[in-house]
Amino acid sequence: MSAADRLLEAWYRGHPALALLRPLEWLYRRVVQGKRARFLAGQGDIYRAPVPVLVVGNITVGGTGKTPLILFLIEHCRARGLKVGVVSRGYGATPPSLPWRVRADQSAAQAGDEPLLIVQRTGVPLMIDPDRSRAVRALLAEEPLDLILCDDGLQHYRLARDLELVLIDAARGLGNRRCLPAGPLREPAERLAEVDAVLSNGAETDSAEGYAFRLQPSALVNLVSGERLGLEHFPPGQAVHAVAGIGNPQRFFNTLEALNWRPVPHPFADHAQYDAAQLSFEPPLPLLMTEKDAVKCRAFAAADWWYLAVDAVPTPAFVDWLDKELARLIPGS
């Protein structure tokens, strides 16, 4: 287990040594609360776009199902006749310049794995730049848009926003409810009371704390041929090498077990870069990975490599709330 994995486990399961990090946590909280206070006071260089901005983000470190939810939002807004664009930091990307327009034929190294996945799946206009405000300006200069989705920009207070959606992993919750580095929180837990909606990935039902949503496996997709097959292609009891370089790899492995397959787990760091040698496992079995990993592996994939396509399925109550908010922000939509 890596040092990062051990720290993550301590945040969510508890460890007495974390008390040593509380002075650093206090400093961190002062910084993030100061940034938030300046934003609310309208101080500093804050950009307000001429179209509504919907931020989808986390207050916890680690995966929460954000990318599948963004894919849902893109398709849902398009179904309402809206022209949607996306801006993202582009974590791990090495583009020639910034801001950078992501195209479907680019590499994950150049565009970032999550932005490339979003563009390949939807064809949406997408701009990456750590400066989200600059990314929005650049995207609007190229595209006539009705709405901007900001991927993981909750703490980027230089960009004004009209709606804030925060995602939480229902199984992990907020861990020990402490901020970095003593806990997994990017902002204090009280921040949840200020956002427009909280969505809990894996929750059974909506609650006073927020809306529920789940990730629904929909197909097996071959990395070499692009062939899309039903989940029944793998019979119950099928053993597979399972590769996951995401924020919470165990969630992927649990999903495969829930489908009655027998995964041999191979967890990697979030946004990991791969080569063929790293993914050469024994015994010979089909290899199954996340779609986020697949965008980095097609160039050297073998014939029996697949990814599991998943779709975010929020509750009807969230969809009703979202439609009312879109109608308020974009009259006639």
Curated annotation (Swiss-Prot):
It catalyses: a lipid A disaccharide + ATP = a lipid IVA + ADP + H(+). It comes from the Bacteria. GO terms for molecular function: ATP binding; tetraacyldisaccharide 4'-kinase activity. ATP binds at residues 60-67. Transmembrane segments: none annotated. Keywords: ATP-binding, Kinase, Lipid A biosynthesis, Lipid biosynthesis, Lipid metabolism, Nucleotide-binding, Transferase. Transfers the gamma-phosphate of ATP to the 4'-position of a tetraacyldisaccharide 1-phosphate intermediate (termed DS-1-P) to form tetraacyldisaccharide 1,4'-bis-phosphate (lipid IVA). This is Tetraacyldisaccharide 4'-kinase. It comes from Ectopseudomonas mendocina (strain ymp) (Pseudomonas mendocina). The gene is lpxK.
